[in-house]
Structure formats: structure tokens, C-alpha cells
Amino acid sequence: METRALSVNLREVKKNGAAKLRQQGMVPAVVYHKGEETVAISVDEIALDKLVHSAESHLIDLQYPDGKSVRAFIKDLQFDPVTDRVIHADFKRFTADEVVEMEVPIHVEGEAVGVKIGGGKLQINMHTLTLKGKPANMPEHFTIDVSALETGHSLHISDLQATVPAGTIEIIGDADAAIVSVAAPRKEAEAEAEEETTEEA
């Protein structure tokens, strides 16, 4: 996974301080690590937005004015419900040998045979996956090829986990959860529903 640099400044936690920072185009944030004191920082809103809205996940090199830097990743974000701007960020610091949990985006490629030939509709049920492992093993995204997916079939978390080299990363979540599915054409689905109703009667 690629590492991106992000300049940060230390900040004082005081009344109305966060609001003033936002007016200056800065986002209040914190950096934390188990067993250590949480550090209050601020980051440039535009620079943070580029990371947040990237199609890839990244490890981040937080760079302080005194030349110090720490490795971290975005653990949590708070958004303004009206403007959708990032109003607060949590960064989790890590060490190279530490096992962490990170969200990475899902990239879907290919045209499902159930859509191309069967006339079905591709349903994407998840847009990110939560992965557990060492930072060096984390991918920037997870690519799913749906070309062979037929009507009425799904790709589950367990299917993806089977493609991951043993001992590298673990996909967190219900193994039976469907990531993508191909739904039957509407008329076919309605016919099946009517058939089930008739059988029940």
C-alpha cells in the first residue's frame, strides 16, 4: 500500500477552537495509539479531502513542523450533515509489525454473464471491505472480477478470502455476506414469486 505525506500542526484543545480552525480551512483531528496519550492536531482541509475521496486507501506519513513524522492511517471521519465536508478526523498510529484493521475500497471489473446474456441486474452490496493484517500486506483496493457471475448468483466474503494468500490478511465480516449479486430480470423474478405463492396456496 502506498504511503502519502500529510502536513499537520499541533493544536490546543480549547472552547470554540475547532470552529475557528474550520473557518481557516483547517480540520481538527487527533492521533492516537494504544497505551499512548492522544495528540490533538489540525490538517489542511483540501489536502485531507484528496486522501478521503481517493479511489485507493493509503498509509499516511503525518509530518510535523519540527521535522518529526509518524506513520498512521485514517480510522474515523466525521462529516457535516449539510455540506458533507470533513469536520473531524481520527488517525491511528501504527508500527510495522503491528496488526491493524483498515477499510479499503472495492473495485468491480468485468461484465457479469448474468447481465450480458441473462438480462439480470448487477447489485453491489458493499463498497468497502474491512481487512485485518500488517500494514505492509494491505492492498490499496480489492478488485473483484464479476465476469463469470450468473443470474441469481453472488460473490461472498468467503469467496474472496479463499483468494488471499494464507497468513497475510483477513477479511472481517460475515463469511456468507454477499458483496455483489446478479438479480434476475424483473419479469422472471415476478414469475418466480407468483409460482411460490401458488405452491403455498
Curated annotation (Swiss-Prot):
InterPro entries: Rbsml_bL25/Gln-tRNA_synth_N, Ribosomal_bL25/Gln-tRNA_synth, Ribosomal_bL25_b-dom, Ribosomal_bL25_C, Ribosomal_bL25_long, Ribosomal_L25_dom, Ribosomal_uL5_bac-type
Database matches in Gene3D superfamilies: Ribosomal protein L25, beta domain (2.170.120.20), Ribosomal Protein L25, Chain P (2.40.240.10)
Domain of life: Bacteria
GO CC term, one of those recorded: cytosolic large ribosomal subunit
Keywords: Ribonucleoprotein, Ribosomal protein, RNA-binding, rRNA-binding
Molecular function per GO: 5S rRNA binding; structural constituent of ribosome
GO aspect biological process, one term: translation
Pfam families per UniProt: Ribosomal_L25p, Ribosomal_TL5_C
PANTHER family referenced in this protein's UniProt entry, alphabetically: RIBOSOMAL PROTEIN L25/GLN-TRNA SYNTHETASE, ANTI-CODON-BINDING DOMAIN-CONTAINING PROTEIN, RIBOSOMAL PROTEIN L25_GLN-TRNA SYNTHETASE, ANTI-CODON-BINDING DOMAIN-CONTAINING PROTEIN
Entry-linked NCBIfam families: bL25_bact_ctc, PRK05618.3-2
Function: This is one of the proteins that binds to the 5S RNA in the ribosome where it forms part of the central protuberance.
Quaternary organization: Part of the 50S ribosomal subunit; part of the 5S rRNA/L5/L18/L25 subcomplex. Contacts the 5S rRNA. Binds to the 5S rRNA independently of L5 and L18.
Membership in a protein family: Belongs to the bacterial ribosomal protein bL25 family. CTC subfamily.
Name recorded for this polypeptide: Large ribosomal subunit protein bL25
Organism lineage: Bacteria, Pseudomonadati, Chlorobiota, Chlorobiia, Chlorobiales
Gene responsible for this protein: rplY
